[in-house]
Amino acid sequence: GEAGRDGMGDTGRDSRSPDSSSPNPLSQGIPPSSPPGPPHTPSAPPPPMPPPPLGSPFPVISSSMGSPGLPPPAPPGFSGPVSSPQINSTVSLPGGGSGPPEDVKPPVLGVRGLHCPPPPGGPGAGKRLCAICGDRSSGKHYGVYSCEGCKGFFKRTIRKDLTYSCRDNKDCTVDKRQRNRCQYCRYQKCLATGMKREAVQEERQRGKDKDGDGDGAGGAPEEMPVDRILEAELAVEQKSDQGVEGPGATGGGGSSPNDPVTNICQAADKQLFTLVEWAKRIPHFSSLPLDDQVILLRAGWNELLIASFSHRSIDVRDGILLATGLHVHRNSAHSAGVGAIFDRVLTELVSKMRDMRMDKTELGCLRAIILFNPDAKGLSNPGEVEILREKVYASLETYCKQKYPEQQGRFAKLLLRLPALRSIGLKCLEHLFFFKLIGDTPIDTFLMEMLEAPHQLA
């Protein structure tokens, strides 16, 4: 189950933003991702964009998820406020109008403004490290001091009687950064450090004796209830529909004078706000540190949006249905020069979702797996995020067995969509960076901020 998603979601790691001095005039109003200096006053105002700019989606996180108390300190060398008329404009939620002034917090200052506080006590506080990967240990598990991630990996391997193989020479590095790369070597290191298989089996027996109390597998669905994940999908779907008056024109023509790329970019920009609302409804996401919430959304936004519009397009033939209500036909995509990636979306995602009749609960669980990405760069506690991802895995597997008992391979088939989402997500980022560089496609404020500061901590 884990193999399909390891290392996913760290999408900007391979795709750096183009130099912020690119000719695109829209980028002048966005904090650059280069080292911050004195505030930059653009010599010419940016040209008007089709929809009015709404500001950064991330003040919504800091306002509606609770302020961390004190504002993060300014990054080194930064003096003065960010003078950006676009980002500092009033945030208005879709379908909800503008909130009161106190609900709007200053935007996140690029990625260099993200402040991840060090763990209490610092590195020299006498904390034990995980014997397998070197991360912070959460205690002794199965006879060895280990982190929650390696504990969960070992437990799942034993309980499901999983077997692994190594693609290299069975001597892969297993550390905090690369522990998900090779499951075979990670498991061998668990055994080499002294983790006991029988301890897992005894724990399972104790869990059965207590009718699923404790940390037995039976508790996982309650910890990550799929009905709440479905509620999150349905809630943001309704919010998206409020801005749609009816099906738009096919191929981006008729009522929409824009080309397909512009339509897709504008739809993605609007959906970034909805994405924040969705994430807040996923169990346990709001309990993560505020900075980690921002990092996870930055790391997964493109895959999360692609998964949504792919599933929304199941009933559309040879095209996709945007959240704005517009249909984009593959012929239009080909004429706009994005036919190859468009066809990959149709064949690797939309048609596969259609063939297996993926339901919205399963879609929500896949998106939650993408969201809880322990490999996102800069997380203050990746182990905690990994535990949440494990809980989604367990809940999704239980749901598949109960809802589709006759389809034994359904859970695995769902997870096989995750590598395709990651690959397509990276390719879409490349296209967006190119459109931004040449500057002939209107890219709105939220989307531009994502491209200016692509989830990389300095």
Swiss-Prot record:
It comes from the Eukaryota. Residues 196-220 are annotated as: Hinge. The keyword Transcription applies. Its main location: nucleus. Homodimer (in vitro). Heterodimer with other retinoic acid receptor family members. Binds DNA preferentially as a RAR/RXR heterodimer. Interacts with NR1H3. Interacts with AKAP13. Keywords: Cytoplasm, DNA-binding, Metal-binding, Nucleus, Receptor, Transcription, Transcription regulation, Zinc, Zinc-finger. Receptor for retinoic acid. Retinoic acid receptors bind as heterodimers to their target response elements in response to their ligands, all-trans or 9-cis retinoic acid, and regulate gene expression in various biological processes. The RAR/RXR heterodimers bind to the retinoic acid response elements (RARE). GO terms for biological process: cardiac muscle cell proliferation; cell differentiation; cellular response to retinoic acid; in utero embryonic development; maternal placenta development; nervous system development; nuclear receptor-mediated signaling pathway; positive regulation of DNA-templated transcription. This is Retinoic acid receptor RXR-beta. Residues 18-31, 57-68 have a biased composition (Low complexity). Expressed in the adrenal gland with main expression in the zona fasciculata (at protein level). Composed of three domains: a modulating N-terminal domain, a DNA-binding domain and a C-terminal ligand-binding domain.
